[in-house]
Amino acid sequence: MLNNKRLFTSESVTEGHPDKIADQVSDAILDAILKDDPNARVACETTVTTGMALIAGEISTTTYVDIPKVVRETIKEIGYTRAKYGYDYETMAILTAIDEQSPDIAQGVDKALEYRDKDSEEEIEATGAGDQGLMFGYATNETETYMPLAIYLSHQLAKRLSDVRKDGTLNYLRPDGKVQVTVEYDENDNPVRIDTIVVSTQHAEDVTLEQIQEDIKAHVIYPTVPENLINEQTKFYINPTGRFVIGGPQGDAGLTGRKIIVDTYGGYARHGGGCFSGKDPTKVDRSAAYAARYVAKNIVAAGLADQCEVQLAYAIGVAEPVSIAIDTFGTGKVSEGQLVEAVRKHFDLRPAGIIKMLDLKQPIYKQTAAYGHFGRTDVLFPWEKLDKVEELKDAVK
């Protein structure tokens, strides 16, 4: 008999993973600037490696931020507080190489092409996209968070791994770690069980592999994963190399923007390629991806589709998106053309419209930079609101 089961895998990483350190540092700097200058233009990139961090990018602002202080505070919060962890917030070197935003880019953002020859100074009309590009947003009704199950559980496990380190439950854990979850789907595309869980966690030198494996199951996996999803066939790989003492930036260099699939949908939906962290909301890589998630989530919550992927695309210096595309993968209750028309009517997808609609000039970005930008249960971001459901239902009647 033909077995129609399907497996799908996603991963997440802890806040102490080198690439995630870089994301959090970039977004901590962004927040520190936006706190005093909501209209700042920020493109902040971070590189971390043994004993040092390099902060580079383009920033135009009217405020002053003590960048080394922000970097050290962020590294301290993550947990790299002792030299023997391979990275120490107090003794690390911090290099900065910051320029202003290019005036060639600024003129297109400050005054969109459509309004350059007109006298409109209204910000929503005047602001152009900070770059060309394509962005995707996705939602599915397979979990209460409207996220695919594999990435949702991966984030929950990674967060739990960090929590038991920070609260002292497993005080031999160190900040670096990764999680991977493989979900089995039935022939109707419903998730039915967890096939495989992989956990790799940095640890102190004096703890045995057997203790780590036992403790991770007892304190991380079983309290996090619903018991009906685990059975005797579920496979667990916990620190499968046998040892993970050297970690963090000492083990691997980290870069801002190198975990874009972790940040979004775990590979379950398409990705336009642009990262989020370190970018102010005039950068549509970030703001339009948030808007696309907002649109997709409200469409699914309205019962208009079981799955929905939204693509937006922009031209640099132009306010209106050059295209809006919606794919419901055959689950739509109305046509995709109807959905596009409803979206055009009820969502302002110009850059300044998105910023206003989602209140994106707030200093909220550091908390997005670990454990996912979407479907979070510990914090409600503006793009996760379900306040367009009734409008969408009415629009397609």
Curated annotation (Swiss-Prot):
Residues 101-111 are annotated as: Flexible loop. ATP binds at H17, D176, G177, K178, R243, F244, D252, R258, K259, K279. It catalyses: L-methionine + ATP + H2O = S-adenosyl-L-methionine + phosphate + diphosphate. SUPFAM superfamilies: S-adenosylmethionine synthetase. Binds 2 divalent ions per subunit. Pathway: Amino-acid biosynthesis; S-adenosyl-L-methionine biosynthesis; S-adenosyl-L-methionine from L-methionine: step 1/1. GO terms for biological process: one-carbon metabolic process; S-adenosylmethionine biosynthetic process. L-methionine binds at E58, Q101, D252, K283. InterPro entries: ADOMET_SYNTHASE_CS, S-AdoMet_synt_C, S-AdoMet_synt_central, S-AdoMet_synt_N, S-AdoMet_synthetase, S-AdoMet_synthetase_sfam. Mg(2+) binds at D19. Its cofactor is Mg(2+); K(+). Disulfide bonds: none annotated. Its main location: cytoplasm. It comes from the Bacteria. Its EC number is 2.5.1.6. CDD domains: S-AdoMet_synt. Keywords: ATP-binding, Cytoplasm, Magnesium, Metal-binding, Nucleotide-binding, One-carbon metabolism, Potassium, Transferase. GO terms for molecular function: ATP binding; magnesium ion binding; methionine adenosyltransferase activity. K(+) binds at E45. It is found in: Cytoplasm. GO terms for cellular component: cytosol. Pfam families: S-AdoMet_synt_C, S-AdoMet_synt_M, S-AdoMet_synt_N. Homotetramer; dimer of dimers. Catalyzes the formation of S-adenosylmethionine (AdoMet) from methionine and ATP. The overall synthetic reaction is composed of two sequential steps, AdoMet formation and the subsequent tripolyphosphate hydrolysis which occurs prior to release of AdoMet from the enzyme. Belongs to the AdoMet synthase family. This is S-adenosylmethionine synthase. The gene is metK.
